[in-house]
From Swiss-Prot:
This is Kinetochore protein SPC24 homolog. One of its GO terms (biological process) is meristem structural organization. Highly expressed in actively dividing tissues, such as shoot apical meristem (SAM), root apical meristem (RAM), vasculature, newly emerging leaves and inflorescence shoots. It is found in: Chromosome, Centromere. Residues 78-133 form a coiled coil. Its main location: nucleus. Component of the NDC80 complex, which consists of NDC80, NUF2, SPC24 and SPC25. GO terms for cellular component: kinetochore; Ndc80 complex; nucleus. Keywords: Cell cycle, Cell division, Centromere, Chromosome, Coiled coil, Mitosis. The lineage of its organism: Eukaryota, Viridiplantae, Streptophyta, Embryophyta, Tracheophyta. Belongs to the SPC24 family. The keyword Cell cycle applies. Acts as a component of the essential kinetochore-associated NDC80 complex, which is required for chromosome segregation and spindle checkpoint activity to ensure proper cell division. Required for the maintenance of plant architecture.
């Protein structure tokens, strides 16, 4: 079996050698070999050019792929940033709405406080007015008491359009009412009439 393989190789080698001799014996055989060599060199050069071009294309693709990857990462980063901005904007809107509601509540409380202060001021004024009225009434009462003790006359000051009052006789325990129409009497006549009533006591 080994001999058959060796014989086969030798036969192939001898056949290749015969073909080569025949090729060299041809008139233009050397030219064909030279032409084939030139074609081989040209093909080899073209292959190198194609290789270099493909290699450059691969590097260019790598560069573009890196740039695309970087842009993708930036895009994801921008998306994340946009999500964060949207979240912060939402929180800001919620805080602004909460602040607006608090301002409304504060305004209502301020209005209520203003009303309470106005009521308190009115109460204080009414209290002071009541105190003045009580004081004035007490003063008037004392004045009337003094008039009554001196003149035995208690004037009626509730109606300023007329002069009226009561004549008091403490000994007899009598009270007599008197009244003068100011539109029918002069001030002088009214004064004389009052003194006449007093002198009767």
């Amino acid at each position: 079996m080994g001999n058959a393989s060796e014989n086969f190789d030798i036969e192939d080698l001898m056949s290749y050698g015969d073909d080569l001799i025949n090729l060299l014996n041809v008139k233009n055989g050397f030219d064909i070999i030279s032409q084939s060599s030139e074609q081989f060199k040209a093909l080899n050069f073209a292959c190198h050019e194609d290789f270099n071009q493909i290699q450059g294309s691969i590097e260019d693709c790598k560069t573009k792929l890196y740039a695309c990857k970087k842009k993708t990462e930036e895009a994801y980063s921008d998306i994340a940033a946009e999500d964060e901005i949207e979240r912060l904007q939402k929180e800001l809107d919620e805080e602004m709405e909460r602040e607006f509601k608090l301002k409304d509540e504060l305004r209502l409380v301020a209005d209520e406080l203003k009303d309470l202060n106005a009521q308190l001021s009115s109460i204080d004024e009414h209290k002071q007015s009541t105190k003045r009225k009580v004081r004035d009434d007490l003063r008037a009462e004392k004045k009337l008491s003094m008039y009554a003790s001196v003149t035995n006359v208690i004037p009626d000051i509730d109606d300023p359009s007329k002069i009226s009052g009561y004549m008091v006789d403490r000994e007899k325990r009598l009270i007599e009412k008197f009244q003068f129409e100011t539109n029918k009497m002069t001030a002088y006549e009214t004064c004389n009439s009052i003194w006449s009533i007093i002198n009767k006591q």
